[in-house]
């Protein structure tokens, strides 16, 4: 029997050009039904599911014809018939034949699926553990509540510490359950065992106060609380019906624990602030150690290093080495992974290996023509190379696919400032703040700088107060210092000079040129400019377009 199931996902649709392929076996073109036989339909679905990747002839034969005795001629006739159904011509090739390899669908495809049903929410109360040390009990209680709160997207709602922290007696427990009616609660006590501890845990369903599970967990001395939290999470998965962590990413990342670390790391990476990138670096490094054979953490970690270098919070040369190591590791695990190839394309162009970088980007785009990641990396590459119009177009394509991508929005803001001027940049900055980047400190620092350049000092000072002091580092500090110069002129120079003296590797950071120009004068800035130019420094190619450096051009 064939392995192919014609209805793998209810209501799923593939959209390409003016065609819509439904999972009920129907094909529409301009809202008119097109007849497509079962075999041709099955082949088309497999090619579309492959998302631009090559599908071998053997795979198609196995999945569509199964155990039936057929040869390649049957597949060839099927492909021919499918091309006629799609009205292929020389200008509109849908199916590409790769001789000796198989077939590939080579047109942009959008997959439309109905929203996944939201998981049923299960409310959980975590009671303070009984321990000899009250302070340690409170600390552990806080850590477990904070850790398990990360599982909210998967249907677990944890009551906050402020509600449960004083719930220690039977009377307190019964009152809490009666007032808030959580679905489940966890209680526990810690018993010393030499240098280690035994944690005895009970999971109780509140309705009927039914004991679901008891377990003793040994905690070795100095073991982090996160390990206990992960073990509790696994127990909850077994005990509470309907709780389901992200099984797709679990299969890719080996375990629930590594999946949750990865998701937290990706979240921090996407926040795109100095503090969040530092947190992402820690989490993604931890994830790589937990799942050394998974591709996604290596790609995310490579992007994290590049972002930190761009933001001026990590040595650029060292960041490039680290990013390349992780991108190469990802390609070793899957040499056709488009995200890894796109990252290597960006890294090679930063190293002035333009031909290699271009080929890698081309390959990545062929494998994944509608990837927000690839669009962002390529737009970033074009921006750094000084191709502003092309960069803006590509970044806009990225934002259409992923409107919430903070890094792409901020890149677009820089391009707009360089390409069409400060007024357009201020308008775009206000637009981004009203959408997805309300509190992003990089965006705020850029707006402060733009407003200061326009002489709107009071508004700039007001906006500066919205930036957290823990985020004022790297490029954010540079932007705010330049704004201070615009506002206070000569009075700001001592602070700027002090900042420049404290910066390491100033000779490898073209992003400091605007401050060098105002603090040390045109002669010293021009000397740095020529040095970067002679070195063919691509970070310099990004900064030499800055309107503030027009004197040095």
Curated annotation (Swiss-Prot):
The modification 4-aspartylphosphate is found at residue 62. Keywords: Activator, DNA-binding, Phosphoprotein, TPR repeat, Transcription, Transcription regulation, Two-component regulatory system, Virulence. Residues 11-107 bind DNA. GO terms for biological process: phosphorelay signal transduction system; regulation of DNA-templated transcription. It comes from the Bacteria. InterPro entries: OmpR/PhoB-type_DNA-bd (IPR001867), Sig_transdc_resp-reg_C-effctor (IPR016032), TPR-like_helical_dom_sf (IPR011990), TPR_rpt (IPR019734), WH-like_DNA-bd_sf (IPR036388). GO terms for molecular function: DNA binding. This is Transcriptional regulator HilA. The gene is hilA.
